[in-house]
Amino acid sequence: MNTDHTKRNLFELYAELIHQQEKWEGLIKAFLSDELRKLDVEHGSKSQLTMTEIHVLSCVGDNEPINVTSIAEKMNTTKATVSRISTKLLGAGFLHRTQLSDNKKEVYFRLTPAGKKLHSLHKYYHQKAEQRFLSFFDRYTEEEILFAERLFRDLVTKWYPSSEEIEGGLPSIFK
C-alpha cells in the first residue's frame, strides 16, 4: 500500500470538494439573488448581497434584537466587519435599528419585512442542505461517521493557518 499516493489522492479529492462547495454556494446564491431582485422590485431598491451579508442577516433573524458585539461573537468575526455589513443591510432595507427601553445607548437590530422574507428563504435552503448532508451519511457505519467527525474536527482546528502564521504571511505558512 502506497500511503503517499493515497495522501495525494486525498488532497485531490479535498480540492474537488472545495470546488463542488463553491459551485453549490453559487447555485444557492444565484437563487437568493433572483429572490433579492424580486424584493428590489417590490421595494424599489437595488441590493446585491454576499453570502457573509446574508449570514449576518440570518444571525439577526435568529437572535433579534441583537447588537453588533453579539453578532460578531456568534459569527466569529470582528465588530468592524459586522458594523460595515449592518450599515449595508440597513441601507438596503433589510434591517432597522432599535433601542431597548432600559438602555438608550446600545443599538440593536431587527429584520424588516423584506429582511424576514430573505431570512426565511435562507433558513429554508440551509435546512434542505443540512438534510441532504445528514442523509448522505446514512451509507456509513457509526465507526466511519465517528472517524469522519474526527477528520473534519482536525481539518477545522489544525489544517488552516493559525493567527500567528497568517500574520507572518505566506512564507511562514508554507515553510
UniProtKB/Swiss-Prot annotation:
A molecular function GO annotation: DNA binding
Xref: PROSITE patterns: HTH_MARR_1, HTH_MARR_2
Record carries keyword Cytoplasm: yes
Protein origin, superkingdom: Bacteria
Gene Ontology cellular-component annotations: cytoplasm
Domain HTH marR-type: 10-157
Feature: DNA-binding region: 68-91
InterPro entries: HTH_MarR-typ, Metal_resp_HTH_trans_reg, Tscrpt_reg_MarR-type_CS, WH-like_DNA-bd_sf, WH_DNA-bd_sf
Protein name: Uncharacterized HTH-type transcriptional regulator YhjH
Organism: Bacillus subtilis (strain 168)
Taxon lineage: Bacteria, Bacillati, Bacillota, Bacilli, Bacillales
